[in-house]
Amino acid sequence: MLVSPYGTPASFSTRNRNLIMETQSPFSRRKMLQNAGMGFGSLALQAMLSQNRLLGMQGTQGHHPAKAKSIIFLFMEGGPSHIDLFDPKPKLQELAGQPLPSSFKPIITPMGEYNAPLMPSKRSWKQYGQSGTWVSDWLPHTAQHVDDLAIIRSCWGNGLNHSNGVCQMNTGSTLGGRPSLGAWVSYGLGTENQSLPAFVVIEDDDGKVINGPRNWSAGFMPATYQGTALHSAGDPIRFLSAPKDIASERQNNKRKLIEALNRKHQADRSIDSELDARIRSYELAYKMQSEAPDAVDLSQESHSTLQLYGIDEKETAVFGRNCLLARRLVQRGVRFVQLYHGSGSRWDAHSGIEKNHSTLCKSSDRPIAGLLTDLKQQGLLDSTLVIWGGEFGRTPMSEKGDGRDHNSNGFTMWMAGGGVRGGQTIGSTDEIGLHAVEDRLHVHDLHATILHLIGLNHWDLVYSHQGRPERATQNEGRVCTKLIA
C-alpha cells in the first residue's frame, strides 16, 4: 500500500510534549531555546519550500506491471458534442424538431432546455479503418487512426456546469480541494527524469482554463505532486530561469550554501523525509534550468515533423506545437502531460454549434492525428496512453435554435496506445444520445482504468489525510477490462 509519510504530521501538542521532556535533561534551557529558534526557522523554510511545485519524487514501482509509462490527456474544455463527432444517431434525425418523447427520461440542464425541440446533426458520417468505426466529417484526420482508438460512448459524470464538470474529470470530485489525477500518478510513481517534473500542464496560449490551477492541484498532498504549468513559448516555466546578470557559477555557489544551511537545520530532524525531499528538489530545479528549455526547443525537429502537427498553418499552429511538446516531454520521461484545447470553455456551443465546432475541430484534428502518427513512428505509442475528451457532452435538444446544452448523462471519450485494445467501440448511449445505457463508465471508472494502465491499483493507491485513507476514486470505480489489450 502506498501511504504517504507526510499526511499525518505530529501535532503541535506532541511537539510541546517533546520540548517539556527535553527541559528535564541537562542543558535543557539551551536545547529548548535552540528548538524554539529552529522552529521559527523551520516555519520560514517551510514557507519557502512550499513554493516549490516543480518536481515529483524519485521514480518508484507501481502495484503491477504497467501497460503504459506515460499519459497524455487531451482535454477539450467546454464539452464537445459526442452526437456530432463519434456517436451518430439516426433516430435523432428522424425525430428532428419534435419535443423529447416521453419514453426518454428528462434530464436537468443548466439552461433548462429539456423541453426544447430535438436538433439533428448536420454532419456527414463515414466508417473508417478495418474496425468500421463511425466518425463525422469534422474529424477526418483523427478518423484515420480509429483502429488504434477505443472509443467509449457511455461515459457519464455528475457535473452540470463547467466548473464542477472540469473539476470532477480532473480530480474525481465536483468540489475543489482534492488531488488531480496527474498528482495521484506523480505521487504513486514519481518521475523517470530527475531534471523534469512528473506532471506537466500546457494551456492554450490565448485562454485560461476554468478553475485554473485547481484542476492540476495536489489538494491535501504535498505541493511537490501538483502539475507544473509549462508555456510553449518564451520561458517554459516562470521564475525558473536564472537572472541574466548572475553567472551560473555564482548561482551554483549560492545554491550550495543554501543547501548546506538546510542540511545543518535538518541534522536534528533526520526523520523529516519531507524536508529532505524539498532540499533535494532545489538541486533538481537547478538542473531544470537547462533541461526545460531544451524540451521546448522545437528547432531540433525536422520540417516534416512540424508539418505533421500542422505547425506550418495558422489554425493548427498553437495546438500542434503543444501536441509536439507533449511527445517531447514523454520522450524525456515525464509521467503525465495534460493539454488543454479550447481553454476558457470555448467548446461550449450553447448557440452556433456549426461555426463553433467547425473552428475547434479544425484547430485540433490535425495536431491530434499528428501526435498519434508521431508516437507510433517514434515507437512510443505502445508505452504512452493517449486520452481525448472533455468534462461532458451535449444534449440532443437544441438551445437557441442552433446550439446544444450541457449533457453529463452520456458522452464520448477515447483512449489509444499504452495497453489499450484499439479498433473498438465500448458502450452506447440511447437512440438520441441523451443517456449512457450500455457498459456505463462513470468518471471514477475512467480514472480507475487509467491508473490500472499505468501500473497503479486504485484501491491500493492510498494517501493518509487527517486519519483517513484517501483514494483517487473515492472508494468507487471499477477497471474497464474491455478496454485493455
Which residues fall in each region the model found?
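Ligand-binding pockets and gating/stacking loops
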Residues: 2-4, 12-485
